[in-house]
Amino acid sequence: MGWIRGRRSRHSWEMSEFHNYNLDLKKSDFSTRWQKQRCPVVKSKCRENASPFFFCCFIAVAMGIRFIIMVTIWSAVFLNSLFNQEVQIPLTESYCGPCPKNWICYKNNCYQFFNESKNWYESQASCMSQNASLLKVYSKEDQDLLKLVKSYHWMGLVHIPTNGSWQWEDGSILSPNLLTIIEMQKGDCALYASSFKGYIENCSTPNTYICMQRTV
C-alpha cells in the first residue's frame, strides 16, 4: 500500500509538473505570437509615417530641379534673342524708288544685310558687283532705321593714316558727331553697330556687311 501511495504521489507530482510546463509553453508561445503580430504592425506604422515624408521630399527635389532647368533654358533663349536677333525694320517710311529684289527700301535708300563673312575688301567688291557700295552713314534722321541694328557689319568707312581722318568710299570725310568711333582693334576699317557707333577693326578680319544703294 505504501508503494502504491508513493507511486500515486509521484504521478501527481509529475502531472503537476507537466501541467506547469504546458502552461509555461503556452505563455511562451503566446508571448512569441504576440510579438510577431505586434512587430509587423509597428513596422507598418513606421513605414506609413515615413513614406509620405520621403515622397514629399522626392517631389520637392524633383520640382526644384525642373525649375532650375526651365530658368536656365529661358535665360539662354532670352540672351540669344537679345544679342543675336535683328530687330524688324519698318519698310513704309517715305517714298522709295525701285530697289533690287529682296532689298530693304527705306527713305530713298536701298539696303541689304549680308550674313556671309568677308574681309573689308571682299565686302566692298561684293557690293560693287551689285551696283551698290558699302553702307555710308550721312544722316541720323534719314537713316534712323540703323538704330535697330544689333550686330557688327562692315561699312564703307576707312582711316587715312596720312592725315588721321576717316573717309567714305566716295572720298567724303566723316561728318562730326555723326558716328561715335570706338577702337576695338588696331586697324584702318570700321564696323557699324547699333546706335550710330563705329568700331575700328582690322580690314582683313571676316565680318558680315551692309550694302547700300541710293535711289535718287
UniProtKB/Swiss-Prot annotation:
Residues 1-51 are cytoplasmic. InterPro entries: C-type_lectin-like, C-type_lectin-like/link_sf, CTDL_fold, NKG2D, NKR-like_CTLD. SMART domains: CLECT. CDD domains: CLECT_NK_receptors_like. Glycans are attached at N115, N131, N163, N202. Keywords: Adaptive immunity, Cell membrane, Differentiation, Disulfide bond, Glycoprotein, Immunity, Innate immunity, Lectin, Membrane, Receptor, Signal-anchor, Transmembrane, Transmembrane helix. Residues 73-216 are extracellular. One of its GO terms (molecular function) is signaling receptor activity. Natural killer cells. Residues 98-213 form the C-type lectin domain. One of its GO terms (biological process) is negative regulation of natural killer cell chemotaxis. Signal peptide: none annotated. The keyword Transmembrane applies. It is a single-pass type II membrane protein. It is found in: Cell membrane. The chain crosses the membrane at residues 52-72. The keyword Lipoprotein does not apply. GO terms for cellular component: cell surface; external side of plasma membrane. Disulfide bonds join C96-C105, C99-C110, C127-C211, C189-C203. Homodimer; disulfide-linked. Heterohexamer composed of two subunits of KLRK1 and four subunits of HCST/DAP10. Interacts (via transmembrane domain) with HCST/DAP10 (via transmembrane domain); the interaction is required for KLRK1 NK cell surface and induces NK cell-mediated cytotoxicity. Can form disulfide-bonded heterodimer with CD94. Interacts with CEACAM1; recruits PTPN6 that dephosphorylates VAV1. Functions as an activating and costimulatory receptor involved in immunosurveillance upon binding to various cellular stress-inducible ligands displayed at the surface of autologous tumor cells and virus-infected cells. Provides both stimulatory and costimulatory innate immune responses on activated killer (NK) cells, leading to cytotoxic activity. Acts as a costimulatory receptor for T-cell receptor (TCR) in CD8(+) T-cell-mediated adaptive immune responses by amplifying T-cell activation. Stimulates perforin-mediated elimination of ligand-expressing tumor cells. Is not capable of signal transduction by itself, but operates through the adapter protein HCST. This is NKG2-D type II integral membrane protein. It comes from Pan troglodytes (Chimpanzee).
